[in-house]
Amino acid sequence: AELEAAGKVKAVVTQNIDGLHQLAGSKRVLELHGSVHRNYCRNCGKGFDAEYVRDYPGKVPLCDACGGTIKPDVVLYEEGLDQQTLEDPVFYISHADLLIIGGTSLAVYPAAGLIDYYRGNKLVLINKSTTPMDARADLLIQAGLGDVFGQIEV
């Protein structure tokens, strides 16, 4: 968030669904797999916040408008991403001067394929274990993402 506020980071692209980037203060967070903080009725599409779902008295939260089942706005296994979800990440990645990828094995597609849109020559990979893209990195840091970002001074 501090790097974004300083104009050093244009966007955060994440597969995480927990909303922690926003909690840390990041403003432009592109959530590939959605967020558990947004929920919607599978029948009528009405939106609900996490508190409604958490405080719902029954086991399965139901829509107060139509009685339909409420689902978190997240991509579940075997569900694909729609093209619109990928448009902004592709834009920011393809226009980046520096691309930092961290905390991912680069094994989950289509998210892992977004690296192919990067046209720059400053690719930084930060991950505890090896990834299929390690050889492409200009800087490879084999460490925990939290440890690395904890040492950055803005």
Which residues make up each language-model segment?
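Conserved catalytic alpha/beta core of Sir2/sirtuin-type deacylases, generalized to analogous enzyme cores
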Residues: A1-V154
